[in-house]
């Protein structure tokens, strides 16, 4: 059995889909369906069972027998960079992850988990997986940063692979439930279909991010699991593109009105990453040599999915 926490979410459900594609169906999805919209991400997938995240971690703490587990992909977390409830964030992202990590260590189960490019904070270069380059700007980034530090201390004692992925700007199918935290592609497409002009923040031609298609993210996860890799790795393409470039692709796809620019929100000043670009040297060094989907192809693929479901 393979366990995917956050398996009804964006990246989690795409990992389940990738596992299905290589023949795995004995999959336990762990998630929180309090907001039920995420169920649509599971409808076309083959899984063995579903458990609520709180019930599942209670079973883990009680040392209940959960069966023969081949791996745990831990995607379950609060991923909102706008959430400032530190107690909630640390309990949900940090403490939950530690409990699951120790369960895997004791049972010698490969543990693959979601970190984030948010650990790098406001820097504009050297996005390298080393402590000296890490300085998060928000409590979400700090929760991921702190767990990465915890993992680094654990590695010398680990008898099974522990692999963390620092996701940059992931976009693609199955993110509808994320609302305001969904990708810019999703929001621009939604605005245009509603008959509204697509909107970007003023200065978006200068705001650049490393955008990676979700299928590429899923493939990196599976490859690292299959090759028993341990480490913390950037999960981006190594190339930055502006939000303006992204918007131009969406506008051209729809042949829509030009972009309308809005003032940059006051509440984001000082806690917003204006530039990210993954250094993927470490990922390539371990042998991952697959190409990444070019941005224009990925955006077009995603728009086709959004408009022809």
Swiss-Prot record:
Substrate binds at residues 169, 180, 187, 201-204, 209, 272. NADP(+) binds at residues 10-11, 31-32, 38, 53, 75-79, 92, 144, 170, 178. GO terms for biological process: ADP-L-glycero-beta-D-manno-heptose biosynthetic process; carbohydrate metabolic process. It catalyses: ADP-D-glycero-beta-D-manno-heptose = ADP-L-glycero-beta-D-manno-heptose. InterPro entries: Epimerase_deHydtase (IPR001509), Heptose_epim (IPR011912), NAD(P)-bd_dom_sf (IPR036291). Pathway: Nucleotide-sugar biosynthesis; ADP-L-glycero-beta-D-manno-heptose biosynthesis; ADP-L-glycero-beta-D-manno-heptose from D-glycero-beta-D-manno-heptose 7-phosphate: step 4/4. Belongs to the NAD(P)-dependent epimerase/dehydratase family. HldD subfamily. Catalyzes the interconversion between ADP-D-glycero-beta-D-manno-heptose and ADP-L-glycero-beta-D-manno-heptose via an epimerization at carbon 6 of the heptose. This is ADP-L-glycero-D-manno-heptose-6-epimerase. It comes from Hamiltonella defensa subsp. Acyrthosiphon pisum (strain 5AT). The lineage of its organism: Bacteria, Pseudomonadati, Pseudomonadota, Gammaproteobacteria, Enterobacterales. The gene is hldD.
